[in-house]
């Protein structure tokens, strides 16, 4: 692809940014990306700054930031708000660690249930199904 990333149509822009056209339009509706003026009788054009912005959004998404959080990061992107950006990242890191702990607990329980399923003999009820039914019963009895 050419290195000239100026004066791009939306299709070429989307390809350069590694997304599809609908993603570009979605980001515009969400306020993450500007919608360029449409010259009379012509089509909108995008430039390198737009490509960089979309790549920023995608990078932030890969780190788990929501679109609202990304909008806040974009607001801070002049490089002078490192403390605020760091605070956002610390909150995200806390969320990630909590999710990892939840996943570890889920893995332990599932592993135990799989072992119990493999260890069962005869026509005994499936430990996994019994456990899930027990949880469902507890949830029903807790309802008002």
From Swiss-Prot:
Residues 7-76 form the HTH merR-type domain. Transmembrane segments: none annotated. InterPro entries: DNA-bd_dom_put_sf, MerR, MerR-type_HTH_dom, MerR_fam, Tscrpt_reg_MerR_DNA-bd. Mediates the mercuric-dependent induction of mercury resistance operon. In the absence of mercury MerR represses transcription by binding tightly to the mer operator region; when mercury is present the dimeric complex binds a single ion and becomes a potent transcriptional activator, while remaining bound to the mer site. One of its GO terms (biological process) is response to mercury ion. NCBIfam families: MerR, PRK13752.1. This is Mercuric resistance operon regulatory protein.
